[in-house]
């Protein structure tokens, strides 16, 4: 079964992008490559219960089992030894990616207190968008009574766009809410 957001992309976003950017080939159209969700846990890396809780929460949110990221080298100042777990990461592609983005846009982001939209300055110059979430409680799958600690996470939306302007228009047409107080068109990128 095709995801709702993917169907919206094919039916509404593709014709809009064809008209706006005047593509000559269907392969020039921007698309979502992947979504990467990363959750680092710094000083709590010595606690195995914290690692298990983070893996459980992220697997519930992403509907996919995350991998444990480990330190490449020892850093004495941060009390990190080589191969010590320092975070968890999950990469979403295909139908799972569209399902997660649909839940993020329509269920999770509106639950953030005083949410004005995402900051459009978080583009990296190559058409990819990165932002952070302070707590996992905004996702409806996470129950407040069953968490041991509030965790934040970084979400990276990787697109095939070549410029930030193209990516902003693409992600806006998908429904991602951007902050309208500081307009993108007035700034030079």
Curated annotation (Swiss-Prot):
Signal peptide boundaries: none
GO MF entries: rRNA binding; structural constituent of ribosome
Primary residence: plastid
One GO cellular component, as annotated: chloroplast
Keyword line: Chloroplast, Plastid, Ribonucleoprotein, Ribosomal protein, RNA-binding, rRNA-binding
Location of this chain's protein in the cell: Plastid, Chloroplast
Pfam family, one: Ribosomal_L5
Biological process according to GO: translation
Gene3D superfamilies, alphabetized: 3.30.1440.10
InterPro entries membership: Ribosomal_uL5, Ribosomal_uL5_bac-type, Ribosomal_uL5_C, Ribosomal_uL5_dom_sf, Ribosomal_uL5_N
Subunit structure: Part of the 50S ribosomal subunit; contacts the 5S rRNA.
Family statement: Belongs to the universal ribosomal protein uL5 family.
Role: Binds 5S rRNA, forms part of the central protuberance of the 50S subunit.
Protein name from the UniProt record: Large ribosomal subunit protein uL5c
Species name: Chara vulgaris (Common stonewort)
């Amino acid at each position: 079964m095709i995801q709702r957001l993917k169907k919206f992309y094919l039916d509404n976003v593709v014709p809009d992008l064809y008209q706006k950017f005047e593509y000559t080939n269907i392969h020039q159209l921007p698309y979502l490559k992947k979504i990467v969700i990363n959750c680092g846990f710094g000083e709590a890396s010595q606690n195995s219960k914290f690692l298990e809780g983070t893996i459980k929460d992220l697997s519930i949110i992403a509907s996919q089992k995350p991998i444990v990221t480990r330190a490449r080298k020892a850093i004495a100042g941060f009390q990190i030894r080589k191969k010590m777990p320092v975070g968890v990461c999950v990469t979403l592609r295909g139908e799972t990616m569209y399902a997660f983005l649909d839940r993020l846009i329509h269920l999770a982001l509106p639950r953030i207190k005083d949410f004005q939209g995402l900051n459009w300055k978080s583009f990296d110059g190559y058409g990819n968008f990165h932002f952070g979430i302070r707590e996992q409680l905004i996702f409806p799958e996470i129950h407040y009574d069953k968490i041991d600690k509030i965790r934040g996470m970084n979400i990276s939306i990787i697109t095939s766009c070549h410029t930030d302007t193209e990516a902003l228009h693409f992600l806006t047409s998908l429904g991602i809410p951007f902050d309208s107080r500081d307009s993108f068109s007035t700034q030079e990128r």
